Amino acid sequence: MFFNPYLSGARKPPNLVAKRSVAKTFLEIVPRGAMHDGQSGLIKHKTGRGAIMFYRDIKHVLENDMAWPCPLPAPPPSIEAFARRLMGPLKFHTYDQVDGVLTHDTQECLSPRYRHHITPSGNVLRFFGATEQGHSICVNVFGQRSYFYCEYADGDLLRDLLASVSDLVSEPRMAYALTITPVQKMSIYGYGTSPIPNLFRVSISNWSMAKKIGEYLLENGIPVYEIRVDPLTRLVIDKKMTTFGWCCVHRYEWRTHKSSTCDFEIDCDVADIMAVSDDTSWPVYRCLSFDIECMSASGGFPAAEQTDDIVIQISCVCYNTGGTGCEENTVFGTSGLHLFTIGSCAPLAGVDVYEFPSEYEMLLGFLIFFQRYSPCFVTGYNINSFDFKYILTRLEFVYKLSPGPYSKLPAQGRFSMYSPLKKFVTTTTTKVFISGTVVIDMYPVCMAKTSSPNYKLNTMAELYLKQQKEDMSYKDIPVKFISGCEGRAQVGKYCVQDAVLVKDLFNTINFHYEAGAIARLARIPMRRVIFDGQQIRIYTSLLDECACRDFIMPNHKGADNSSEPTDVSYQGATVFEPEVGYYSDPVVVFDFASLYPSIIMAHNLCYSTFVAPGGESPPESDVLTVELESGLSYRFVKNTVRNSVLSELLTKWVSQRRAVRETMRSCHDPVKRMLLDKEQLALKVTCNAFYGFTGVVNGMMPCLPIAASITRIGRDMLMRTSQFVEENFAEPCFLHNFFNREDYSGDPVAVKVIYGDTDSVFVCYRGVTAAALIERGPSLAHYITQCLFVDPIKLEFEKVFGSLMMICKKRYIGKIVGETELSMKGVDLVRKTSCEFVKNVTRDIIQLLFDDPEVSRAAVQLSRLTLDELKMQGVPPGFGRVIQRLSQARDELYTSRARVEELVLSSVLSKDVSLYKQSNLPHIAVIKRLAARSEELPVVGDRVFYVLTAPVDGRSSGVRNYEIAEDPTYVREHGVPIHADKYFDQVIKSVTNVLSPVFPPQTLRKDKFLLGILPHRIYLEPSFLPYCVKASEHC
């Protein structure tokens, strides 16, 4: 069919940005207090006056093409002037990419040179970035086909099949260009030396149609490969391009009628773009941090779906990131601080304040501002699940205004949010997509980067910035807002403060540099690094390696489908139960460096080396067989037959990380050093993700034989290490080779491995000083490595515990030699669910055990007593200090001297309240009580805090926690008494968990034993106190 690209006036299309206009009629919602100070309620009516705003008392009509009134940086040069400065190819840095589909009748002003790529329809890949001169640019790349592989008997028959399938897939359906080519490729899944028979590459010009057709073939049992690989991934792999870094375009044409809002826009062919691989520097990019304040008509916490729950203020902070630090600091506005508010507002120092008559006009003004400023990165705190969600919901449901045209692609852009309704939904699964802008919510970033009892902005500001925010209750915000312009200024100051704090967090944590490094390494867009987890990183990297080796990657029906049954299970790497007890002799800890990656490399494990049942089978001498404890066995060819793709990829990245770290040592430029550090961190994180990629049954390409073999080999390595240590480390010859006479403590030398878990070995070394073990530790680790393992597996010396309490598997407390703080794992002190009171009591008792020699000796003595001996001799005297601390804690609880703040418990709200099937959970009960009182409600991902209160009916037992759980603020403000029995029971359990190794071995109920050695006391109700006298008055 012939397509004339110039029909319908496509030669000179209109300017897509300037053509749009703002609706003159809209719903006006205004708080009464914005017009009449102090009055509550809303004014709502339709108006046709047109949208306006006021800036410095000057009225401005809101139009999409309006000049923004605040002070602005100098505009970019004209296309002609800029083009004259360029000599040769155009170099630009890309940070974001968007794929799309254009048809032959597109309204975009496209040169005839590129029109054949979209006839009848074709992919366009838009690379957003910045030029070397710092100007924003959009590079439209044409000619990248979508393709996948398909097994079929005949190419002509396959073409007929695809033609019929094209009419069966879901709407919208479009015409496309199709090419079918026979190819010689092998599947990476399973060892084999023969290409896949009757294999064709199906190349389709339209990604939307290619995806639908591929999925249809897969669902109908036709063998297909790589059907979910999008055209952007095809380009970066086929061309060895980058998704985050510097690129070069050799031949291109300037767009005079742009489809984007960037300073400049060019079109090019896919053959004319390439990456500049050596340069990892950043240009200057624009960033925006924002925050919103809302007001509920009901007085409760606002809900966006409620028409009367409006946004009243929006704060924005404009700033730059990247660059070398030598660039001129351009400011958008007076100082980069902006406040959008309904109603008049008193001036705020250094803040550009925009006043709007209604919510609609304020939201519209924010969207126009957003597009004028055109940020490359936007950040905030919980903006994915609240701020963006709130604004987008208001625009869609209340005002019927599409925000897409306010992205960097006014005609085809997206400005949307996606919240999948799954069983376990957290804030990190809420995705915000803005064409040309990368969204980095600092709330999930902080949750991933640190362990904290809560992740409120104030807590993170204290942790990272050593700052405290001036807090304002959501209940106070409406009161101040409607009080007058001064009150609105107070709310505005609070709103701006939050956006500034997030900007400082953004620049302190520097997650954007880390995400950029991962994007460059894994060849995926930066937004996918942020939102899509580890699987896509490994999949794309593996796809890249396959392309170099004529391998292709298979697809499976659904996430659960793999070549192995999903009920295949394998045991983790914990080797043996620990020798529980208190150790006063030194305990040496050895760790395997990068255990799982090194196992893959050392043993040539891979999809491509796995000998599948019924497949090609080389001689047994060329095969590694891994026997599982279940009786199953898996076989892999050795590297003499075929090198593992996973191994080669890991080897390359490990070497690359070593080189980067070496470069860091001699780098004195702080910016370059920070970029290098993020690069080596990206390499480390991605290397460690390989094991999870193969072991997740519902992952993108699971292979349980690989995952099970890795864990089995890891278990065997720990067992061999344990056996080797116990057989050799106490032998006279060994001791003579490694230790001198002064290294011995005087006790008989005895060596015992007391624990082995995943990648660590704990060795109790009696008779040798801790100082000697620290000095000789690296040599001991090197000796084990040489004797037992092959490269690159390496055992490393980590630390020496001077004393250690081994409680049970994955739980221990110890004091590392040379450090003052205790090292803990798995105990209540490091659990976020425990209250501070319990932690403090437990911590005090642990400190007594490790710091007080008398208590330590008493603990060892107690652990060696039988129950009969204990009845005769009593508890060792030194243990009395532990009993005294427990008695003190009991007194504080039963006499109401414990502070409410110390008694707060918490649980994570992991999904929406409506999705919980159990109603008898304390944190859910608290949320329901908060809702009944119209209090501020936590969002998904938050920790919900509560206190256990005394039951109103006076019951002391049989009370469930959810019946007495209450909000801490409510308890404090209303003086609600606490449930002392519940809290002291937690104290006893926590201390028992820590001290149980020192209790007599025959003790069955260790918590009962601990309660039994405490002195008995009776606590009277407060009403009896007037009738009591002090003991001293009887004397």
Curated annotation (Swiss-Prot):
One of its GO terms (molecular function) is DNA-directed DNA polymerase activity. Pfam families: DNA_pol_B, DNA_pol_B_exo1. GO terms for biological process: DNA-templated DNA replication; viral DNA genome replication. Belongs to the DNA polymerase type-B family. The keyword DNA-binding applies. Gene3D superfamilies: DNA polymerase family B, C-terminal domain, DNA Polymerase, chain B, domain 1, Helix hairpin bin, Palm domain of DNA polymerase, Ribonuclease H-like superfamily/Ribonuclease H. It catalyses: DNA(n) + a 2'-deoxyribonucleoside 5'-triphosphate = DNA(n+1) + diphosphate. GO terms for cellular component: host cell nucleus. The lineage of its organism: Viruses, Duplodnaviria, Heunggongvirae, Peploviricota, Herviviricetes. Its main location: host cell. It is found in: Host nucleus. Its EC number is 2.7.7.7. This is DNA polymerase catalytic subunit. Keywords: DNA replication, DNA-binding, DNA-directed DNA polymerase, Host nucleus, Nucleotidyltransferase, Transferase, Viral DNA replication.
